[in-house]
């Protein structure tokens, strides 16, 4: 008889404020919520919420991912977040609005999109 795997329930930490990182790429949107020191409290992405393929890059998918991450973070007692947005994707604004709509108070908003000072050669232009 095989041993039964016991799923250990995550302990509820009391974290009143944290940092929300929204990474919006052209293909997906990933929302990670951490405590002020950087330890991950909750995370979600458009793929985790149930979207596949090109539907992951939609604003609606980003909205659901942000709501999912916010709900998980609020279970740990989080109320206030600083938001760092990275990337050029279509889910930037909708993910931010979803965090506010889920009940998190946005204290600060900062764009941390990396801009090269003429670093690596970019990928070739798409011709459609």
UniProtKB/Swiss-Prot annotation:
GO terms for molecular function: rRNA binding; structural constituent of ribosome. Keywords: Ribonucleoprotein, Ribosomal protein, RNA-binding, rRNA-binding. The keyword Ribonucleoprotein applies. GO terms for biological process: translation. One of its GO terms (cellular component) is ribosome. Located on the platform of the 30S subunit, it bridges several disparate RNA helices of the 16S rRNA. Forms part of the Shine-Dalgarno cleft in the 70S ribosome. Part of the 30S ribosomal subunit. Interacts with proteins S7 and S18. Binds to IF-3. PANTHER family: 40S RIBOSOMAL PROTEIN S14/30S RIBOSOMAL PROTEIN S11. This is Small ribosomal subunit protein uS11. It comes from Desulfatibacillum aliphaticivorans.
């Amino acid at each position: 008889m095989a041993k039964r795997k016991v799923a250990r329930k995550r302990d509820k930490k009391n974290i009143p404020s944290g940092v929300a990182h929204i990474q919006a790429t052209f293909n997906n949107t990933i929302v990670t919520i951490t405590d002020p020191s950087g330890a991950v409290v909750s995370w979600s992405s458009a793929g985790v919420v149930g979207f596949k393929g090109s539907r992951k890059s939609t604003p609606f998918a980003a909205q659901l991912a942000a709501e999912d991450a916010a709900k998980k973070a609020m279970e740990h007692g989080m109320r206030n977040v600083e938001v760092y947005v990275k990337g050029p994707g279509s889910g930037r604004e909708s993910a931010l609005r979803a965090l506010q709509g889920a009940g998190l108070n946005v204290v600060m908003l900062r764009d941390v999109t990396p801009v090269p000072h003429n670093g690596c050669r970019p990928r070739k232009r798409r011709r459609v």
